[in-house]
Amino acid sequence: MGDYMFKKSHLKYVKISIIIFIFLCLILVIYYNYKNNKSVKTNAVPASNKIIILDSGHGLPDNGATGFYMTSEQEINLKITLKIQKLLEQSGSVVLLTRSDENGIYDISADTIREKKISDIKNRVNIINTSKADILISIHLNKYAASSVYSGWQTFYKENNDESKKLATAIQSNLNKNVDNNNDRIPMKIKDVYLIEKSNIPSVIVECGFLSNKEECENLKKDDYQENLAWGIFLGIQDYFEKKES
């Protein structure tokens, strides 16, 4: 009888301990989500279940622009893109990448640099137009060799496409508010860019900053600055879909 009562009492203690442990875990999760303003509730965001293509500009052997300290555009493009991907997937979006590592996506039959670039861009367009995606965001960096004074991001949208303009406006606005409200640039229409011209969905290029500006180049190499850019772009995407569906 004594052993039975001891075992029963011990079992009750174990159950209570488990309940307390689960309760404490829930409290910690709630506290973490409260403290971390970049945590996302999947069922509360407009882009949930949307298909979004993220295009990381360039890719080896095409480095894109080169900035101070031999900073490679293609490398930073990819880092920002992967951070946006993480935020979107946490929010329930389906994310497709045109490239997921440092390499371009040219055909193996392409031999010269020129052939690889042409093959790469055509393959990107094919991914976009066969994906049934809702939007395309192409991530790039700017460079102006004649002057180092220019800095800041700017969005560019597909000409004669109202949805592209709305998307570019939402992203530009949220970047300005969440990264640097001194940036007063507005979205610009763009033409003669093959990827944007040939895409059959709302398409935007985000030039995330100038590698020709030393201070901005240093910032663009920093993980936390890339996180801020990704967060601003993420919020812009949410803003676009919220207005589209309202």
Where do the protein language model's features map onto the residues?
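Active-site-adjacent mobile loop/cap segments within catalytic or ligand-binding domains
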Residues: 183-246
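Conserved hydrophobic/aromatic pocket- or pore-lining residues that grip, position, or stack substrates
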Residues: 54, 77, 171, 206, ...
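Short, charged, low-complexity patches
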Residues: 77, 164, 168, 222, ...
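Active-site-adjacent substrate-binding region
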Residues: 162-189
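Catalytic-core regions of hydrolytic enzymes
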Residues: 39-52, 58-166
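N-terminal Lys/Arg-rich, disordered targeting/topogenic segments
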Residues: 1-14, 20
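Hydrophobic single-pass membrane-insertion segments
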Residues: 30-39
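Hydrophobic membrane-insertion alpha-helices, especially the h-region
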Residues: 15-31
